[in-house]
Amino acid sequence: MQRDTFAVTVNGKLPGNLARKMTSYEIGDDFAKAAKYIDLDKASVEVTIDGKDSTDRFDIHKEGTKVWASAKKSLLDTTYNTAADRAVRMTVEGAYLKGVLKAGEKVTMTNGGWEKWNDQEIPSNEPPVKEWSPNPDKSWIRLENGKWEAVIDPSESNKTGADTMKFLDGDQVGSVVNGTIANDLAKVNDITLTDDYANADYLFDLTGDRSRIRVYEADAATDAKSSVADIINTGRDVTDRFDITVNGTKVTAKAHADYLAEQVGLKNPKQITLFLPGTVDFADGKGAAQVRKDFNKAAGDELTFCENPDGSKLANSGSEKVNDETQPTNEPYICGYVPPVKKKVIAEGSQGGANQDANDKVVYPGQRVEYRLTTKPQLPADLAYDVVHVRDTDTYDQYLIPDKQTLEITDLATGTPLVTADPPMGVEGDYTAAWDDESHELTIAYSDKYVQEHWTKGSHPQVQVRFEGTVSEDAPTTVKVGNQWALTLNGSVTPSNIVENNPPKHDPSKKDTQSSAQGDPTVTIDGKTMLLGDTGNYTVTLDLKQKDNAYRVWRAGITDDYDEQYVSILPSDIEVLDQSGEDVTGRFNVQVRDGVAYVYAKTVDTFVPKTGRTIPGDPQPEDLAAYASASGHDPLNEPAIDQTLLGQEYQVVMPYKVVKVTDGYTVRNKAVQVTNDTKAETNE
C-alpha cells in the first residue's frame, strides 16, 4: 500500500579459511527497478554478523538507487584464516511513495542487491513484491419493490442508481460507499469507509435509527474496482465487525482488529460497502415553501433543483482507507422537485363579479367568493419513484361557509369534468371528496386508476378544483379570511400560495361644533351648555377610504338619530363635503324623518358583467329609513352606488338649532355608518 513501510534484507557472508585478509567487502541493495514506487532510508541500515549487531564495523552509503555497507579496516583485518564462514545480513527500511499509483492500480516490482569480495561482485536474487491502491466509488440508491437497490459505479460516472434523479420531499433515498480489499495484502492495520453528505444536507436527512446503517462484504472478481452490484441483498452483513461513528454529516465505519487480521492473504478479493438509509427532507425540514424562498421563487411555483441555494451541487462524497492510504470516491448528486400548486380567490359572478382575481380585496360578510385550486406539473421523466397517490387538501377559513355542491374538478388539458365516485350508484369515479367541518378542510383523493393514467413520469397533468363559499355574517371585521391548499404526491406535501380577503374597515366619527352664525365651526362645543335658540353643527365623518373591494359597494351612508325634542335639523341645511372641502351633496340622498337624519350615496347605473346588462340607478329610494334598514342585496338586479366615491372620507355637516331646554338635561347624539350590510357606530 502507498505510504506503507517495509524492510528489505540482503544476505551475504564473510568467507572462512582465507589465505589472506580481504582488502574490501561490500553488501548492498539496488532498488533501481522499483525507484518509481519506493525509497530506502540510509539512516535505518543495520548490519549483523552471525546475528550480532555489527553496524559500527561498516561505513554506510547511499547513492542514487543504491544503499550499501562497506567493511571498515578493523573488520577486514579479522578476515584472515578464520575457522568458518560468518553470516552477514544488511537490513534497510523503506516506504512506498505517496501519490504514485492510481486508484485501483496494482503493480509488481523487483529489488536487487549484491555482495562484493575484494574485486569479485555477485548479484543477489530479485524477489518480486506487489503494491496496490484502493479504488472506492459511491452512488445514491433507491427502493425497488420494497428493497434497497444497491449499485456500483466503477467508472465513477455519477449516473448509476438514483444519481441525478428527481426526488419529492419525504421520499426514501440511500447512499452507498463501495470499497475493495486486495487478496494479497501482507499486512492490514486499518480499513475505514467514510461517507460525508455535507453538500447534500439541504436535501438529505440520515435515518435517526443508527442501527439501520450497515456494512456488507462479498467476494469480488477484482480488487481494482467495485464489482458486486446487489451487495445489500446478496452480500454478508458484517456491521457488527465495524465501529460506526456519526459526526455531523460524516459517517465512518472502522473495522475491528480481528476483522483486519482476517484480511491478510485473502483467497479472493473482497468488496465492502457502507450503506446509509435516509429520507429526502427539503430545506433541512422546512419544506417546499422554504425551498421556493431560498431559490427566489414565488409561493406556488414549480421548481427542480440540483444545487444548494449557494450554487453547489447536492452531492455526496466518500473515501476508503486501507492502512495509511486514503482514496476518495466520486461525488454524485441528486435533485429535488417541487410541483406547482396555485391558489386563487375569484370575484364570483352572482355577486356582480367578473371572475377577476380577488386576492387581498375587501369582501363583506354575506358575500360569496370562488376558490380555484390549480396544478399543472411537468413531472420529470426521471422521478425517483412513480406517483401512486395524489391528494388535494384545502384548508379554508373558519368564517367561510362552503357551498359543497359547487365543488367541480376539471381536467384542463381536455376541458373534461372529472367524475365524483358514487359507489351505491355503481359510479367508480375519478375522485372522492370529504368535507371536515370541524377542521375546515376539504380532502380530495384521486382514484388509483386516474393517477396511473394521468400522473406518470414525464407527463403533464392539468387539474383545476373549484368551489364557492360565503363569508359568514358573524365574521369579525378585524380578521382576514384566508385559504390555502396542499398537493400530496405519495408522501410529499407541497403547499400553495395563501389567498386572503380583507374585512371591511370603517371608522366613522362625530363632533359637535359652533355654527358659523354664532362662532367658529372648527371649535368644539361637546359637553358645553347651550341656551334656547343657540345653533351648532353636528359633523359626521363618513369613512369610505377603503376602496379595494372584490365587489361593488351597493350602499353607503350615515343614519343619525338625534334628540328631536331639544334640537331641530332641516334636511335642506345638510351638506356633504369631500376631503378637499368641495360640496358633493348632490351625489347623496338626504332625508330627515321622525328625528332621524339619513344621508346615503345615490345609486347609479350599474353594469353587471355576467348578464351584460346595465341596471338603472334611478329611481332613487323614496324612503331612506326603509333603505337604510333593509338587509340583503341582489347584485344581478339592483344598482350599486358610484364607486368613484370610494377612497376618501366625507364630512356630513348637519346644522341644528336648540328648540327646548331643560335645566341639567344632557342632549346626546350618536350616528351609525352603514356600508352594505355592515354597521359602525360613531363616538357619542
List where the protein language model places each region.
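Extracellular/luminal low-complexity Ser/Thr/Pro-rich, glycosylation-prone repeat/linker regions
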Residues: 1, 101-103, 107-162, 292-358, ...
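Short beta-strand elements of extracellular/lumenal beta-sandwich folds
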Residues: 2-24, 161, 165-192, 363-389, ...
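Low-complexity, intrinsically disordered segments enriched in Ser/Thr together with acidic residues
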Residues: 6, 10-11, 67-109, 114, ...
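One face of beta-strands
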Residues: 12, 43-45, 111-115, 179, ...
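Beta-strand elements of well-folded, non-transmembrane domains
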Residues: 12-16, 31-33, 94-98, 115-119, ...
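Long, low-complexity, polar and repeat-rich extracellular regions
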Residues: 19-22, 86, 116-117, 184-188, ...
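A surface/secretory-pathway sequence property marking extracellular, secreted
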Residues: 21-74, 189-258, 385-446, 553-625
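Surface-exposed intrinsically disordered loops and tails
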Residues: 54, 78-82, 141-167, 219-245, ...
